[in-house]
Amino acid sequence: MLLKFLEKIGRKKVVLDRGPSHPKFHEAKPWMNRYYLIFRHRPKWFPFNILIHEKLADDHGEGVHNHTFPNITIILRGGYWETLSTGKFWRPPGYIGFRSANNLHRVDLKPGTKPLTLFISGPFGLRKGPRSEYGIDFKSKKN
C-alpha cells in the first residue's frame, strides 16, 4: 500500500541495469524500483536520504560496485546473496548492513524473488577510487 502511494505521488523511479554511457545500453532492463521517502533529488549539502529499494534482478554483469556515499541497508522482505572481498553471504530479512563508500560488493537474488530494502544513504563525496570493477577476483585483485 505504501509503495502504491509513493508511486502515485511521483516518488517511484525504475532503475535500469546499466546507464546511457554503457556500450550495450540498448539491452538495458529494469533492475530495481526505487521509492524516495524524503528527497527525490537530494541536495548535495543534505547529509542523508531514505529510500526503499525493490530489487528486480541481480547486479549487472560479473562485476562489483560501490556507492558515492556510506550507506545502511535493512532488508525488509526476501533476502539476497551479497558478495564481498571476504566471501559470499546470505542476507535474510532483518539483516542490517553498514557500508563505507569504498566497500565493493555485489548483490544476487534467489530466482523469482523481489527483495525489499530500506536504504539510508549518507553524505556524498566520501568514496576514494573507482565506482565499479568488472570481472574482479577479490582474492588476487586481478581481472
Model-assigned labels for residue ranges:
Residues F98, G112-G129:
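A short hydrophobic beta-strand segment most commonly corresponding to one strand
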Residues T83-R106:
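Short acidic-glycine-tyrosine-enriched beta hairpin
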Residues K44, H60-H67, L84-F89, D108-K110:
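Short histidine-centered beta-strand/loop micro-motifs
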Residues T68-P70, V107, E133-K141:
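Beta-strand-enriched cores of mature, soluble protein domains
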Residues R18-F25, P123, G135-K142:
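A glycine-rich, hydrophobic/aromatic-adjacent loop/helix-cap motif
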Residues N66-W81:
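Short, conserved beta-strand element in jelly-roll/cupin
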Residues M1-N49:
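A short, N-terminal "cap"/entry segment at the start of jelly-roll beta-barrel domains
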Residues N49-H67, A101-N102:
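Conserved short histidine dyad/triad with adjacent acidic residue
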